[in-house]
Amino acid sequence: PPPPPPPPPPPPPPSPPPPPPPTTPRWYRRRQRQMCIRDRLKEASESQEFRNIFSGSSILPNSNPYAMCYGGHQFGNWAGQLGDGRAINLAEVEHSGQQWALQLKGAGETPYSRTADGLAVLRSSIREYLCSEAMFHLGVPTTRALSLMLSGDQVLRDVMYDGNPAHEKGAIVCRVAPSFIRFGNFEILAAQEDKATLTALVDHTIKHHYSHLGKPSKGTYLKFFKEVAVRSMDMVIHWQRVGFVHGVMNTDNMSILGLTIDYGPYGWLEDYDRGWTPNTTDRTNKRYRYGTQPQIVLWNLLQLANALFPLIEEAALLQDILKEYQQEVDIAYLEMMKSKLGLFEKDKNDKILITELENSLELSETDMTIFFRQLGNFKSDGSQDGLELVSKAFYNEKEIVKEIEAKWKTWFLKYAERLQKELKNDTERSESMNTVNPKYVLRNYMAQL
């Protein structure tokens, strides 16, 4: 006789009760022009009900807020199951034909909080609010911030990690994005060998966010992976353009839509240093330093490829896409740097010119943002002193000793010669450069006040 069927799996453990509501929630900042608070919702945002929902005090009717389970590779090692430890997905809304997910960060404990309290403080919440909006307006793919609320509660945090915790003001940010699905959502299912749920998640993601790729099939899954790679490459090239350093590029912090997500220990390059990272816990190995970010994206894509392999079952096809990324990211980086220099015509020596510039920028403390913005005023006829033009970018002009000065003058001579091959005049070139070289970035000291 056939063996008896296996016993049914045990029921899942009960979810913990919802976190207690904030004591006295009130608005700290809200974007009335944002995609979700406008027109008829603008008036609603003044209501007590609206404040209750966006502080986590109450939920929308007929909604079922949830926290997501995901895994991830952290600093190059598999960390197992992780999940939304202090993020709660409120709902998804549609506005002007676009789907938006609303997520609260800091509203309290979730099933994945482990030993943490699920809360956030005003200091880190302001950092996330400001940076996500700054990135959006600099043209960088990113999640956005809809609102920032004070909870009215005090939250205990050890800011300096020195064993002296202190109470800070609690706060809650509402994040907005088409989706908050991460690489880690796929990784955990592959690790659990749950092919059915993995397939369902991939199909859901394609249906709602990559529907142009067609109906689910092995070919569609490959096209999906390739487009995720392209979007991720576009994101990281923009990071390099504006000097943004994420700081914690674990696979659980990689958006499946190619958006910048999770603004934690981020920072902006001030003096140009390809080895810099803002993450103090990464200061020894500097895995996530500025100069390696494009390669870290490739490594993370490899982990996503491993997670998707059960649906494709041909490693060579996935490897081909990863090889394409390596080739294309080098080209994309070169084109991005050329745009920062106002170079639009092809020249076989451009890569050498850019490498020499990057090396010169590291000879002394040179402010990246100021340097490239000032460079837009350079005259192609070589009639001005390039070093004097960018002198505001040097933190200490006394560091510009004769050897460094000579290297800079040599580079500016080559740059002036190269500009002679361009079709745009100085005014047109300057205008083009100013569209990619920001005048202002969110300076680290401002974000840490």
Explain the meaning of each model-derived region.
Residues S124-S125, V155-D158, D162-H246, L257-I352:
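ATP-dependent phospho-/nucleotidyl transfer catalytic cores
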